[in-house]
């Protein structure tokens, strides 16, 4: 069994997260979760990635909906969330917004916590 692989990025870093997930999939390395916050690109999408969480704001010149749909792709348009659809939440601030950070945390924690484990799994350095 492999250690969980979770990739998170914002803006151009989100584009890089998509690319890294895709390339790892091509190498046969399973990716548990790719989280993108307002990516400027909608692909590449890998069928090997178990889940994508894309939090985006379309129409601001940055945010893109991921090109794939299905049970493994969650496109979350923040205009549909009353806690986020408000002045001051934009491409440059959304990655620090507590609501967005909680979404990311809630997506990651079930992956990195083993059943019955009280704390998060320890990350590897390197």
Explain the meaning of each model-derived region.
Residues 47-126:
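Lipolytic serine-hydrolase domain surface
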Residues 1-69:
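Serine-dependent carboxylesterase/thioesterase catalytic core
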């Amino acid at each position: 069994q492999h250690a969980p692989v979770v990739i998170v990025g914002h803006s151009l870093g989100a584009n890089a997260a998509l690319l890294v997930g895709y390339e790892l999939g091509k190498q046969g390395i399973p990716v548990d979760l790719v989280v993108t916050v307002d990516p400027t690109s909608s692909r590449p999408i890998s069928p090997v990635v178990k889940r994508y969480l894309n939090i985006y704001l379309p129409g601001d010149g940055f945010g893109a909906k991921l090109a794939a749909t299905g049970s493994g792709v969650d496109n979350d348009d923040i205009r549909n969330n009353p806690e986020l659809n408000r002045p001051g939440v934009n491409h440059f601030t959304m990655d620090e917004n507590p609501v967005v950070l909680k979404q990311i945390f809630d997506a990651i924690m079930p992956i990195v916590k083993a059943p019955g484990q009280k704390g998060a799994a320890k990350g590897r350095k390197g």
